[in-house]
């Protein structure tokens, strides 16, 4: 960012639409929704394109997503007449040639770094703010997520407009508007990622089943490394560039 701007301090009482509007107004052309094609993104896509039909959306393609996820991807692009910015990891053939079979089992941290974290870093490269579907009730690691704050891990702003929404809030919004959503949700998948690391389950218990992992690499890096130092905008917080510091802890 080259121009200074000042953010309001009362975002906790703001609606999801108001948070999105603030992001669009504050970071024109340099804010994007990170889309993983789950129910939260079904809600946010509808809200975002209602506010700005030219809004930016990006997705990480690990080449291991479910067929249903890829079909929803195409449906979203048709519905909103948009092209989702794609950031991909190595193809399965490239992974095997370089690291052998089933890297996600033999070296899961390396797989996440290659397939998710590296593409995410590229996606965030020209952004000043990114938007996610993180909700506080999804996992203990997300319980204190701010609606907007400074993401120290990536050195940009991060917005979680649905932070205070529940599962039922999301489904009510989807039903009332007849929005497309990932049909895997109807088959018991609350959280959806790669085919090899996702099983049916409530909350995030179906992700990385059989391990003690609750977050994929890109979320964990942001939530643990970044959001522990995230700040909510203070009354005199003026941002001017990516090195901006904020004054008061976002969890207070």
What residue ranges belong to the model's regions?
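Nucleotide-activated chemistry modules centered on ATP-dependent adenylation/adenylyltransferase
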Residues: 1-252
């Amino acid at each position: 960012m080259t121009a200074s701007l000042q953010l309001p301090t009362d975002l906790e009482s703001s609606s999801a639409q108001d948070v999105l509007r603030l992001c669009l107004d504050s970071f024109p052309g340099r804010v994007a929704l990170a889309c993983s094609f789950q129910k939260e993104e079904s809600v946010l896509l509808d809200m975002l394109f209602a506010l700005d039909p030219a809004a930016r959306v990006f997705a990480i393609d690990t080449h291991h997503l479910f067929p249903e996820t890829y079909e929803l991807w195409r449906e979203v692009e048709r519905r909103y007449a948009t092209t989702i910015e794609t950031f991909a990891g190595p193809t399965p053939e490239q992974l095997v040639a370089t690291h052998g079979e089933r890297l996600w089992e033999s070296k899961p941290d390396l797989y996440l770094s290659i397939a998710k974290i590296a593409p995410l870093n590229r996606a965030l490269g020209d952004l000043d703010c990114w938007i996610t579907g993180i909700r506080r009730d999804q996992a203990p690691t997300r319980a204190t997520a701010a609606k907007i704050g400074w993401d120290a891990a990536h050195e940009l702003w991060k917005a979680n407009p649905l932070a205070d929404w529940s599962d039922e809030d999301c489904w009510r919004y989807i039903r009332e508007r007849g929005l497309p959503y990932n049909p895997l949700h109807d088959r018991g998948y609350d959280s959806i990622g790669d085919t090899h690391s996702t099983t049916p389950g409530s909350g995030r218990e179906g992700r990385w089943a059989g391990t003690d992992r609750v977050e994929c690499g890109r979320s964990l890096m942001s939530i643990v490394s970044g959001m522990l130092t995230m700040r909510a905008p203070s009354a005199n917080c003026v941002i001017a560039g990516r090195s901006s510091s904020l004054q008061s802890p976002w969890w207070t």
